[in-house]
């Protein structure tokens, strides 16, 4: 098939060299080959299921199949991987639209119970990026392990309002950089653009909804109830060329600590 196990091993080895001990399989169910290699190499996994529930993000998304297939797909996922030692936790969603509706917590409860019935031993989380909404509709309170995508400055407020005693940075940073490109003056910027369509490797640039690595580290170090973070991302990937959404020829992300060729950026060494 299309899976190249040598490529998987190389990527995991690079992440281990950076110091990572866990990979989140965003935002879909991982290939069996990936999980097997993670088992062999000692890399832990947060196995994720869905990027969309019943409310659509896109016209041709999983919402078309959610009602009929969500329980079946989630059941198959957990049964398939629950005996793999690399699986550390489960994720039932990522930035779903149900975060902002009144019954969103009910859908989360439904999916979480499916997982819990099949595997009562592992934590279950959900990547939530709208803290105010999920605190209001109780989706955050419903989760076994609260996972917040971004706003680390919301952690303390959320902790005071939630029954759980732990918080996870389920998706963090989204710092922007291009390997070997350095922009002056060196200053923190949001959504900075340049004629060469690159981002500075000084790691001082981010999106208007994200932040720099040290912003997360401050909270991870100072708040005893935070248990770690999944940075976005380990590697650059095709698509989402923020902040150059429509400028040709940009077509890959700038988020990675490692570029598309597998070569470390400066941020790789910062994390290490």
Model-derived regions, located:
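Extended substrate-binding grooves/exosites of carbohydrate-active enzymes
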Residues: 1-272
């Amino acid at each position: 098939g299309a899976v190249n196990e040598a490529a998987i091993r190389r990527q995991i080895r690079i992440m281990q060299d950076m110091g990572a001990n866990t990979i989140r399989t965003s935002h879909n169910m991982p290939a069996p080959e990936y999980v097997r290699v993670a088992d062999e190499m000692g890399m832990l996994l947060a196995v994720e299921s869905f990027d969309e529930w019943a409310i659509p993000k896109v016209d041709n998304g999983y919402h078309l199949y959610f009602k009929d297939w969500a329980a079946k797909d989630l059941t198959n996922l957990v049964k398939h991987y629950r005996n793999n030692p690399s699986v550390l936790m489960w994720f039932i969603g990522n930035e779903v639209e149900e975060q902002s509706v009144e019954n969103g917590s009910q859908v989360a409860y439904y999916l979480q119970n499916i997982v819990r019935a099949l595997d009562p031993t592992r934590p279950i989380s959900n990547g939530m990026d709208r803290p105010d909404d999920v605190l209001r509709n109780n989706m955050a309170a419903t989760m076994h392990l609260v996972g917040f995508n971004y706003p680390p400055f919301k952690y303390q407020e959320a902790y005071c309002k939630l029954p759980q005693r732990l918080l996870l940075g389920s998706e963090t940073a989204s710092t922007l950089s291009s390997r070997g490109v350095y922009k002056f003056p060196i200053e923190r910027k949001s959504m900075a653009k340049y004629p060469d369509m690159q981002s500075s490797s000084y790691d001082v640039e981010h999106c208007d909804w994200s932040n720099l690595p040290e912003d997360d580290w401050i909270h991870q170090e100072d708040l005893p109830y935070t248990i770690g973070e999944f940075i976005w991302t380990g590697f650059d990937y095709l698509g989402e060329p923020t902040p150059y959404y429509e400028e040709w020829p940009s077509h890959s992300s700038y988020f990675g600590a490692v570029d598309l060729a597998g070569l470390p950026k400066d941020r790789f060494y910062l994390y290490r």
